[in-house]
């Protein structure tokens, strides 16, 4: 991608980054971590400044530093948080197009909140992953889901130790189905999860 190409050009060697998370089309990442090996003598803390001079305006590096050789961003003890912002009104707002999903049917945030209790915890999320998911296990732990409305914006924030391909997008879609009255909170969520015994 753009980051690998820019790093390779900057450092004069082929660079392949490993990121903590993937980002789908239309997704903005804040606080994503990436690591790469290099033979450069450039101090780690200076790389972010040089990168930001070359990267497109919609990509910014907040910090760069040297890490231990065994550091891997996907496997460090941390949680990931995804946030979906839904513009919930009759007509779209052009200035929100890049940062929200437009949905014109009225959403009942209280019902959406009620449905989250069935999704929090350790579950088999097999029915919450996209067809491309090729993993050893579909068991994941969701540590928190918050849903709130601020004016016309409904926000769904999902936190967990790791997610399957498209899992958060499917969780958000399920909560939207509950919020528009298509399903009661308990039915739609229980259909999709099976509690580990």
Residue spans for each PLM region:
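Structured-RNA-binding interfaces characteristic of tRNA pseudouridine synthases
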Residues: 1-194
